[in-house]
Regions:
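A short acidic/histidine/glycine-rich donor-binding loop in glycosyltransferase catalytic cores
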Residues: 164-170
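Alpha-helix capping/helix-boundary segments
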Residues: 20-22, 65-66, 156-157, 175
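Carbohydrate-associated surface elements
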Residues: 20, 40-41
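Nucleotide-sugar-dependent
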Residues: 103, 107-144, 151-159
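A short, active-site helix/loop in glycosyltransferases that binds the activated sugar's phosphate group
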Residues: 4-5, 9-34
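Nucleotide-sugar donor phosphate/pyrophosphate-binding loop at the beta->alpha transition
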Residues: 1-6, 43-44
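A charged, aromatic-enriched C-terminal amphipathic alpha-helix characteristic of glycosyltransferases
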Residues: 171-174, 178, 185-218
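Conserved catalytic-core segment of nucleotide-activated headgroup transferases in glycan assembly
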Residues: 41-110
Length: 220
């Protein structure tokens, strides 16, 4: 960390994924006073996606081998994943869609369901610290596709999800399953409607453009 802090301290301004990250860097020795918070990733999407339909299923993006919960998925909500998986484990409760490029992936996600953002649970304490400071790329992927999300209550963007009404903020996978099973079609469609504006912003580079403008203004 000292190497990076020394490098950052040569800058006039730093761009951080969250407010908590800036505070952590200050604790590590950062002296730069000017900073801008990223908040969200963008996608450049120039195609028509589906309007999500109500389905009680979860999508997950990531290297399955790094996430133990795949190995004993026993919930009523079907779990769908993309990419390769280790044949040494029993994934009978998980549906694998194979590898898809960005265009194919967004089209598939946009058909309906929920997007899951979750940690690998290898070190629960460090995981919470990481997600409190990190800006989740998975979250932006699901929102870009226009589907509601399931996120842990310690995620840096959890308040954003709750305030916008674009998904469920939960404390466990058990609660995630319960929320989806109790969700009605009307509830789901309302979340999809709430998501339209956020989806438009992400798919048209709003957050990156705002980041540049905020940076220039802060340096002026």
């Amino acid at each position: 960390m000292p190497y990076f802090i020394d490098m950052y301290n040569k800058a006039e301004l730093v761009i951080v994924p969250s407010e908590r990250m800036y505070q952590r860097l200050v604790e590590e020795g950062l002296t730069v006073k000017k900073y801008v918070v990223q908040k969200m990733w963008d996608f450049n999407v120039h195609m028509d996606l589906h309007t999500p339909s109500f389905e009680r299923k979860l999508y997950f993006l990531g290297d399955v081998s790094r996430f133990p919960f795949f190995q004993n998925w026993q919930y009523d909500t079907p779990l769908h994943a993309f990419g390769n998986h280790n044949s040494d484990y029993d994934y009978s409760k998980v549906h694998f869609g194979g590898w898809l490029n960005k265009t194919e992936l967004l089209l598939e996600l946009s058909k309906g369901g929920f997007g899951l953002v979750w940690g690998n649970q290898e070190d629960p304490k460090d995981e919470k610290v990481y997600y409190k400071m990190n800006c989740s790329y998975k979250l932006a992927s699901y929102l870009s596709a226009g589907i509601p999300v399931i996120v842990p209550d310690y995620l840096s963007n959890a308040d954003f999800v709750k305030e916008k009404g674009i998904g469920f903020v939960v404390s466990s996978l058990e609660e995630a399953n319960e929320m989806i099973q109790n969700c009605t079609e009307d509830n789901y469609n309302q979340m999809v409607t709430n998501l339209k504006h956020v989806q438009y912003l992400i798919n048209n580079g709003y957050f990156t453009k705002k980041l540049f403008v905020d940076t220039i203004m802060a340096l002026d």
